[in-house]
Amino acid sequence: MHTERQKHIRNFSIVAHIDHGKSTLADRLIEKTGTLTEREMNSQVLDNMELEKERGITIKSQAIRLIYKRKDGGEYVLNLIDTPGHVDFNYEVSRSLAACEGAILVVDATQGIQAQTLANCYLAMEHDLEILPVINKIDLPSARAEEVKEEIEDIIGIEASEAPLVSAKTGLNIEQVLEAIVDKIPSPQGDENAPLKALIFDSNYDSYKGVVCHIRVKEGNIKPGDEIKLMATGKIYEVTETGIFVPNFMPRAELRAGDVGYFTASIKNVRDARVGDTVTGAKNQAKEPLKGYRPVISMVYSGIYPVDGAKYGELKEALEKLQVNDAALNFEPETSVALGFGFRCGFLGLLHMDVIQERVEREFNLDIITTAPSVIYKIGKTDGTVVELTNPTNMPPVSEIKYMEEPIVKASIITPSEYVGAVMELAQNRRGVFRDMQYIETTRVSLNYDIPLNEIIYNFFDVLKSRTRGYASLDYELKGYKSAKLVRLDVLLNGDMVDALSMIVPEERAYDRGRGIAEKLKGIIPRQLFEIPIQAAVGGKVIARETVKAMRKDVLAKCYGGDISRKRKLLEKQKEGKKRMRQVGTVEIPQEAFMAILKTEE
């Protein structure tokens, strides 16, 4: 079923490695089609969160409708669905791609193919999308367009001889990209009279309308007043508004098969409108949902505590507000002896965690302390039950543990060939299991490893970058669980265990890690008037110790000359005081201490 209207629609997204110029290319397409006036154009239109602009990354998917008039007078609707490029947001990317028929693959002419270029490209291929390579940054003197074309053909195996050579920065050859979109990307198919079937590829919360669902209609149509059903949750709502993105919401009478747009239906929470869910009619239902939906799984957990305990309520509100727009964030209250009341939060990955923490501080003006991130371990107990452990302090006693499993990821690292040795050494140090390696071209290699997620969280990326002078790129996905010998490493300050500093480490590494942490903390914890022992312990046995020396307060300053016994009396008194102080004194732990645990040197 292919109507005349559908022949003039193209739905596509742009995929690329970080910094290859995806958002800039989107800006040029928007500008070229005259979608926004010059006054409304600001750079990176689709990255509208302050943080996105600052870090130069795309966090949320966005969509925009472009109208392109060809020279022969034909008018086409191009729906551009922008995707996040970072590996944490992999699932969001896959849902955005499922809403399209084609993808533009942007490759930097100076850098060639990188790990996420490949990862995103394979994702697009899994969705049977028509892939359109575009080579960007050809205005740079170091551009090597022809070699990059060969690379694309050899590695990805798609025809690249006619790939447009563009410069998104200067706007060179952007017209060619628009022509290629119309010529190469297939138009949507789908029966407008069939029962409604639409894919939610994103949702966001609007304080007036409730949840706004961004959808691609696959079959049927949707208009205000319709009763719809969300298939994953089974809930039924009445549609209050439908419309399109220009990039702001613009109401329309209806959306039909092939369209990309949004609808609102007084949905209260983003969790009810899950990304990847299928929307269908409440009465005239589709037989089965669109495939590929899965609930979002948190990979990394971290504790977030207010610096001022009285702000607990405000922190809760802040997290609730962020959660309304971010279904991947989950949190539950937890208490720590050291930090008081706070929340254990689950995130998609390290970048997601960073972004949320920064947004809490920025948008809600809260000072927070965050504990070192941890992954989910599975523990089989002797009584036959299996528990999931997200917080190291909740680890059951050793006598109750039968086995422990940790998450393993499939990591692919692309690096210049002269650094292969350094990268392999790093992966082996991190308990990586070598799978295979392929040469991409004579100078670049792709290495595949299975590595515990625990090791990746632990500054893997930073070390990888420094060992390869910033040239290597990394992509990973969860593979499954594998049993391992793990122990809990506790940190004691002044004889008291600080629960927020506990971490789970492989048994054979406990000693090194313990020593590293003790040394690191020694440099961070401020000196007090009494000395503070820092101890690392496993199962009650101390394995490393450092001491923060006491500051000396000169109690003899007011004695000029005079009798030695007078001085001795003052010194004895000071000694007594220090002893008492050590018993009741508490040690202030600065925020850096929690993060420093992650950064102990290799």
Curated annotation (Swiss-Prot):
Pfam families tied to this protein: EFG_C, GTP_EFTU, GTP_EFTU_D2, LepA_C
Catalysis: reaction(s): GTP + H2O = GDP + phosphate + H(+)
Highest taxon of the lineage: Bacteria
One Gene Ontology term from the biological process aspect of the record: positive regulation of translation
Protein name, per record: Elongation factor 4
Catalytic class of the enzyme: hydrolase
Domain tr-type G: 7-189
Main location: membrane
Subcellular location: Cell membrane
Binding-site positions, GTP: D19, H20, G21, K22, S23, T24, N136, K137, I138, D139
Function: Required for accurate and efficient protein synthesis under certain stress conditions. May act as a fidelity factor of the translation reaction, by catalyzing a one-codon backward translocation of tRNAs on improperly translocated ribosomes. Back-translocation proceeds from a post-translocation (POST) complex to a pre-translocation (PRE) complex, thus giving elongation factor G a second chance to translocate the tRNAs correctly. Binds to ribosomes in a GTP-dependent manner.
Annotated membrane topology: Peripheral membrane protein
CDD domains hit by this protein: EF4_II, EF4_III, LepA, lepA_C
UniProt xrefs under InterPro entries: EF-4 (IPR006297), EFG_III/V (IPR035647), EFG_V-like (IPR000640), EFTu-like_2 (IPR004161), G_TR_CS (IPR031157), LepA_C_sf (IPR038363), LepA_CTD (IPR013842), LepA_IV (IPR035654)
Gene: lepA
A GO cellular-component term linked to this record: plasma membrane
Keywords, sorted A to Z: Cell membrane, GTP-binding, Hydrolase, Membrane, Nucleotide-binding, Protein biosynthesis
Family recorded in the similarity comment: Belongs to the TRAFAC class translation factor GTPase superfamily. Classic translation factor GTPase family. LepA subfamily.
Organism name: Clostridium kluyveri (strain ATCC 8527 / DSM 555 / NBRC 12016 / NCIMB 10680 / K1)
PANTHER family noted in UniProt: TRANSLATION FACTOR GUF1 HOMOLOG, CHLOROPLASTIC, TRANSLATION FACTOR GUF1-RELATED
Lineage: Bacteria, Bacillati, Bacillota, Clostridia, Eubacteriales
EC assignment: 3.6.5.n1
SUPFAM superfamilies tied to this protein: EF-G C-terminal domain-like (SSF54980), P-loop containing nucleoside triphosphate hydrolases (SSF52540), Translation proteins (SSF50447)
Example of a GO MF term: ribosome binding
